[in-house]
Amino acid sequence: MHISKPAGPLPASVPFYRQLYFQVVVAIILGALLGRFEPAFAESLKPLGDAFIKLVKMIIAPVIFLTIVTGIAGMTHLKTVGRVFGKAMVYFLFFSTLALVVGLVVAHVVQPGAGMNINPADLDQSAVKSYVEKSHDLTLVGFLMDIIPNSLIGAFTGDQVVNGKLTGPNILQVLFVAVLFGVSLALVGERGKPVLNLLEALIAPVFKLVHILMRAAPIGAFGAIAFTIGKYGVESLVNLAWLVGSFYLTSLLFVLVILGVVCRLCGFSVLKLIRYLKAELLLVLGTSSSESALPSLMEKMEKAGCEKSVVGLVVPTGYSFNLDGTNIYMTLAALFIAQATNTELTLGHQIALLAVAMLSSKGAAGVTGAGFITLAATLAVVPEVPVAGMALILGVDRFMSECRSLTNFIGNAVATVVVSRWENALDRDRLTLVLDGGEPPLLAPVGEPGVAPAALR
């Protein structure tokens, strides 16, 4: 990693009204107001949110590919790749399991579904039928096989056709191809240098494109939040407020207490990290998709002192294997349904639920509406909990989706710093400077001192 001093004086402070996080906040407020008072019109704005997410997905594959390939090809020892991946998977497995256990414990303590006395036979199962059907495709073997694309191009375009359209890039497939190509490039040595130089030269314009696309974030957040409030209404939260509130509070405590302790042990503050990522978090909140902020998260983590090779491996992998918010939601929602339908679950049933959830949460990687579909897959394997009970939470799932995405996002940001520190691939002075609000020296690609992609402010 080459660091150069900025040429000339630092740029003047950007006015608050031009900062992305302020624009996204205003957009979310306006979208919520429009959804509340003009719900019919607000529903028609859904394409704004969808279009922005498509724009971001368009650039995700190139960002991941370039970051991973240049990072791996620049490593002096290829054993480092396996070591980083192994450490990341150990971290992901531990904290994903911990999140599932936390959801289970909170459900027992809070009892959000107690006293509802719902008869599963009286519920409209047609509302959740499509989710249950999708969940049947989520198997561990199918998930592992899906990591391997049918072709190199297929990883970037999507191999499957849904409603006559290609599904788009698969993050894990792009990761798989990028790792193989990066290793191959490193093995050919000097002969691969021209290719590596070309890919490194492409990084700056690609991240500049990310910066340009992020300027449309307020429009996307406005459309997405207006649609959500307009379609589902704030009123739908009232009946299930105890469940929604329990989930939000549990996720907050998980981030501040559990992840907070991890951050403190690693020498930084989770609150400062959240402040540093405020623009991305607001974007995730507005679009209800942590994927929408993936490119800028990778950029921000590298800017904060994490080595590019570690960022390139940990962040995309974490988006599939480190879903803390989704895991909390799964066990909490499953026990809520059991309590609401007066279904008694023994300790054995709950251990089985935990084991199935550990596997099914990995099988939902990259699936739209992953939390709800994964819950359906889990309940289908644990027959004691009626799948029909999912109809109880269908109306508020969209409101819990934001919290799932935010928790997943923060969890992956923390994981990136922790694994970087674990791997001695973290510039601690730079991290401290950035989290304290300072402007660090520019990061420059090899051979191009002083040139760096514009970081999202």
Curated annotation (Swiss-Prot):
PROSITE patterns: NA_DICARBOXYL_SYMP_1, NA_DICARBOXYL_SYMP_2. It is a multi-pass membrane protein. One of its GO terms (cellular component) is plasma membrane. The keyword Transport applies. Gene3D superfamilies: Sodium:dicarboxylate symporter. The gene is dctA. It is found in: Cell inner membrane. Its main location: membrane. This is C4-dicarboxylate transport protein. Belongs to the dicarboxylate/amino acid:cation symporter (DAACS) (TC 2.A.23) family. It comes from the Bacteria. One of its GO terms (biological process) is L-aspartate transmembrane transport. It comes from Xanthomonas oryzae pv. oryzae (strain KACC10331 / KXO85). The chain crosses the membrane at residues 22-42, 55-75, 90-110, 138-158, 168-188, 209-229, 242-262, 335-357, 376-396. Keywords: Cell inner membrane, Cell membrane, Membrane, Symport, Transmembrane, Transmembrane helix, Transport. The keyword Cell inner membrane applies.
